[in-house]
Amino acid sequence: MEEAKGQSILDKMLTTFINTLVKAAENEAQTHFGKIREEVLKHFMAKVNSDFEKQCLLWHFTKKGQTMTVSSEVFERIAKAAVASRAASEKLFHGPQKVIIKGKVYYSQTISFYENDEFDYALGCATIFFDEEGVPVGLKDIYDFNEAKHRDTNAESDTTFMAKFEKANLAKSYAILYGINDYDLHD
């Protein structure tokens, strides 16, 4: 991956990191990943087009499974996208499910972010928590490269490839959280 002029610091960090990863894989496991690995990585990186997606990918490789808590500003954008995708997501997944967290009623719903360029390669599908008035108040997602039948063939191929980094212990899945969620209730 060549560095382009005018890149942000995050872009430069990610480019350097991916170049290092590619070089390490070439030196250590050329026969396992081969030239196709480099092409798929470049293809995948071209799709990671928002600062949030880049941050999530770097976290995957560098934070050893440490939970990420998103900022209020990021959650506001996620919440706006979730509200816009809520009806369409109900057709793909279940509708809102009543949950009680710390004695209060909320509704959790799986939301697909695959139609959102800022969050598709970071969240994919995530659980958003809504208060009784339907206002988003929380987020729970596991950043991983798991198989999913709802993805198109190309996205599933990218996911399968990236999962190999986890299997080789070069990366680790982690939770992405914000506000009200039931993550601690299930662990």
Predicted features, each with a name:
Residues 38, 42-46, 53-187:
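Catalytic toxin/effector domains delivered as secreted proteins or via bacterial secretion systems
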